[in-house]
A protein has these predicted regions:
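Glycine-rich, acidic/polar active-site loops that bind/position phosphate-bearing ligands
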Residues: 1-467
Length: 467
């Protein structure tokens, strides 16, 4: 009878050699490595290699046909190479058992960098776009770290066909499936992914698990693993988890509020003890940049037709471009914190949803904020009243603009944005627009008539099974 795999270190590897030593130890039974990368929409793509191939793959990379992935590459330049990043190596916290007695194995996971055959970074790689943005922040603004913490909300349903809630719990009510949230966290912890807390969200069947703050690239990779683990654990319980932004009419949708701050040499650049909101000039300019470019980054942060069914009045989602401290109807909130917790100074961008391409969304929002610093963008006055209840005249007095009404408007604005074109690069910019226009055409063919904020049956059929 075959013995179970030995306990092992599952994360936090310093280099490729340490990964190889762990993988090739026969007692660990790590037989396969999944190499993961995002497609143009941020969905996880992966393929597995046998452990015996890992040494050569670290050295040479692995070739693949990029034209097989929709919107990823032009067919005349389809040959690409992916090189695994050893810093991202983790071991899945379970053991696979096949029908044969000897079929017992573990799997590892690594994110990969996509290269051209000449060894240059591939312009269509979303992960590279975020890396390039972070390099720009270091080079032009002397910012050595952007820390962020997204709040990814999700629904749990009985299956992937009908958005039928499995409970009637509300915000912080116990509801059902607390054990699902706990198991997700236990497995994440075993992979070195820290969480802060979990709770039932406001809508029926809606949940949230908050991830501990990380540097931006690490967080984007972590969010990809998080979405995979949420769905896998739900399946293990005979349920279906979805990050679809708005699956149910008359209920709150799922957001991905992104808390963020800029750091230099271990110092939070957003903190100023003398400002009423404890925000430094850097923070105020950054916040103003996010507001100034809010409409331009919307298509990236809210990339689905269904995303705009969430961004409507009355469901705790932002519609108006304003900021405040306690104001949850605003586009940006500045969370309060206890005295002595100055490192927690941050801003919370409330518009993104968890079905975005998180690499591109991070790149877009960081570039917008940094543009505010570069341009010394003036910060409008805060708005602390409920904007949904403000009269039109008061909204005009505060010069409050609105986010795009729908994906079509968001794409029109994005297409004219030099900031987003430069951030994404020509290849991804054009590919993203083309992909989203096809989506709009399919929506129009299946949902005739004037655009409606109600979630259509078509959206449930089209989005629920894969978001």
């Amino acid at each position: 009878m075959h013995s179970d795999p030995r306990p092992l270190k599952a994360f936090g590897f310093k280099d490729a050699q340490e990964v190889l030593d762990t993988v090739l130890d026969p007692g660990h039974k790590i037989e396969f490595i999944r190499i993961v990368f995002p497609d143009i929409l941020g969905r996880p793509m992966d393929f597995a290699i046998p452990a015996s191939e890992l040494k050569d793959t670290f050295r040479d990379g692995k070739g693949f046909d990029g034209s097989s992935i929709e919107g990823f590459v032009r067919i005349e330049e389809s040959d690409l190479v992916i090189k695994p990043d050893p810093a991202t190596f983790r071991v899945f916290p379970w053991t696979y058992r096949g029908f044969a007695e000897e079929a017992v194995w573990r799997e590892g996971l690594m994110f990969g960098d996509i290269l051209t055959p000449e060894g240059k970074p591939y312009e269509g790689d979303s992960r590279y776009i975020l890396k390039r943005t972070l390099a720009m922040a270091r080079r032009e603004f002397d910012i050595d770290d952007i820390k962020c913490g997204p709040e990814l909300e999700f629904f749990i349903f009985p299956d992937d066909r009908t958005p039928r809630p499995t409970d009637e719990g509300g915000y912080f009510f116990s509801g059902c499936h607390g054990e699902v949230r706990k198991e997700i966290q236990l497995l994440l912890h075993r992979m070195g992914i820290e969480t802060e807390y979990d709770h039932h969200e406001a809508a029926n069947g809606q949940h949230e698990i908050d991830l501990a703050f990380l540097s931006a690239l690490d967080m984007a990779d972590t969010a990809m693993i998080f979405r995979y683990m949420v769905k896998k654990v739900a399946r293990m319980h005979g349920l279906y988890a979805t990050f679809m932004p708005k699956p149910i009419n008359g209920q709150n949708g799922s957001g991905m509020h992104v808390h963020q701050s800029l750091w230099r040499e271990g110092k939070n650049l957003f903190f100023d003890p003398d400002h009423p909101y404890r925000l430094s000039e850097t923070a105020r300019n950054y916040l103003a940049g996010l507001m100034a470019h809010a409409r331009e980054i919307s298509a990236v942060c809210n990339q689905w037709t269904n995303s705009y069914k969430r961004l409507i009045e009355g469901y705790e989602a932002p519609v108006y471009i304003a900021w405040g401290q306690r104001n949850r109807s605003a586009y940006i909130r500045v969370p309060e914190y206890q005295p002595g917790k100055e490192r927690a100074t941050r801003i919370e961008l409330r518009s993104p949803d968890p079905a975005c391409n998180i690499y591109l969304a991070f790149a877009a929002m960081f570039t917008a904020g940094l543009a505010g610093i570069r341009d010394k963008e003036p910060l409008p006055d805060p708005v602390e009243e409920n904007i949904y209840r403000m009269s039109n005249s008061r909204q005009k007095k505060h010069e409050i603009r609105t986010l795009p009404r729908d994906l079509e408007e968001a794409l029109r604005i994005m297409e004219k944005s030099g900031l987003i074109r430069e951030t994404l690069g020509e290849h991804l910019f054009d590919g993203f627009l083309a992909n989203k226009r096809r989506e709009l055409a399919e929506y129009a063919n299946n949902v005739p008539g004037e655009y409606d904020k109600q979630v259509s049956d078509y959206e449930v059929r089209a989005y629920l099974p894969f978001l």
